[in-house]
Amino acid sequence: MNPNQKIITIGSICMVVGIISLMLQIGNIISVWVSHIIQTWHPNQPEPCNQSINFYTEQAAASVTLAGNSSLCPISGWAIYSKDNSIRIGSKGDVFVIREPFISCSHLECRTFFLTQGALLNDKHSNGTVKDRSPYRTLMSCPVGEAPSPYKSRFESVAWSASACHDGISWLTIGISGPDNGAVAVLKYNGIITDTIKSWRNNILRTQESECACVNGSCFTVMTDGPSNEQASYKIFKIEKGRVVKSVELNAPNYHYEECSCYPDAGEITCVCRDNWHGSNRPWVSFNQNLEYQIGYICSGVFGDSPRPNDGTGSCGPVSLNGAYGVKGFSFKYGNGVWIGRTKSTSSRSGFEMIWDPNGWTETDSSFSLKQDIIAITDWSGYSGSFIQHPELTGLNCMRPCFWVELIRGRPKEKTIWTSGSSISFCGVNSDTVGWSWPDGAELPFTIDK
């Protein structure tokens, strides 16, 4: 084939391809035009669609109302439930600087709540975190037993004092923040702000640093406003779906209530608190769902606060010897008897033990029948508080009593630039238990401290 024939052949092929392409384009235009005409003439006729659309619906977990009408379970001792080892892990991992951890349970899970300092362990921002109240403190939570890291934790509220509890439907959180002379408690229900409570004495409004207590859809908390070393003002709040529906101020002259540990028992609420003014035994307040209340002090000569005198003769009023200052704590009332949790040291926040005094709620002697070791006196402890596992969680027909212990490390007792803590928890059982020591165990100082 000579060059002219090649040119003619290639040109013919290109012309044929062009004609075919033109015909296809014309056909496509006609098809679109016909489709448009059909849609115009039949506007209500459904158009078939072969697209596959996936719909994602979040399945809400079944909710119940936590009745709180059961009595405390009979127990003979305490089984270890959790230990987060957060200070040990935080020497190399990303762990929040925290204090005031506490545990609360819904009908599905238990969570550790804690007040962060807006800083991580072994980091420059941990410097000076011995301070209680700052605008950087937040309430966060994580699954019980896990170290409070940024990757496993959930933000709850901006707060330097807090409480939280679950009514069977949603979490209620109470976070107090703001200046000492005008702080405000922000109430959230299911993560949404629902109410606020303004400081009524303008003197460091503060709350429990442990779980509130829920009965039949209502949740109850105790707040303090006023001096930490003399008469202050104390209020009980009844909260439903995050809104305050009733409150009452306690008529409690010569009493001092701070950082109450509250739990439901047979449809009523019992709170055991800290007297920072003049009592080395613990004050209590119990009330029904209408906020009709009774007040007193644990009578036992086995004293529950720290600092405190050696055990001796108790009082159903404040025991003033070594009564100033104190530490958050708890007890569980069983009729006339009481389980008392306390530091082993009478003068510092070290060691921890549980003591059963079979008549200690009402009698003043110092005899007791059981003692279980939790932390050795040579190791640091700190705050402690109660929490309850409802029958809806455990499947029992009673309220399981539990407690947590904060294990404070760092300042002011150790040579670090920071203050933080880990936590352990125990639950009451009516079977075999063991006493031992479960300390924090971190080796200090950290790199940032050197």
UniProtKB/Swiss-Prot annotation:
GO terms for cellular component: host cell plasma membrane; membrane; virion membrane. Its cofactor is Ca(2+). Residues 28-450 are virion surface. Its EC number is 3.2.1.18. GO terms for molecular function: exo-alpha-sialidase activity; metal ion binding. It catalyses: Hydrolysis of alpha-(2->3)-, alpha-(2->6)-, alpha-(2->8)- glycosidic linkages of terminal sialic acid residues in oligosaccharides, glycoproteins, glycolipids, colominic acid and synthetic substrates. It is found in: Virion membrane; Host apical cell membrane. It is a single-pass type II membrane protein. It is an enzyme of class 3 (hydrolase). The keyword ATP-binding does not apply. InterPro entries: Glyco_hydro_34, Sialidase_Influenza_A/B, Sialidase_sf. Residues 11-33 are annotated as: Involved in apical transport and lipid raft association. Residues 72-450 are annotated as: Head of neuraminidase. CDD domains: Influenza_NA. The influenza A genome consist of 8 RNA segments. Genetic variation of hemagglutinin and/or neuraminidase genes results in the emergence of new influenza strains. The mechanism of variation can be the result of point mutations or the result of genetic reassortment between segments of two different strains. Intact N-terminus is essential for virion morphogenesis. Possesses two apical sorting signals, one in the ectodomain, which is likely to be a glycan, and the other in the transmembrane domain. The transmembrane domain also plays a role in lipid raft association. HAMAP family: INFV_NRAM. Catalyzes the removal of terminal sialic acid residues from viral and cellular glycoconjugates. Cleaves off the terminal sialic acids on the glycosylated HA during virus budding to facilitate virus release. Additionally helps virus spread through the circulation by further removing sialic acids from the cell surface. These cleavages prevent self-aggregation and ensure the efficient spread of the progeny virus from cell to cell. Otherwise, infection would be limited to one round of replication. This is Neuraminidase. The lineage of its organism: Viruses, Riboviria, Orthornavirae, Negarnaviricota, Polyploviricotina.
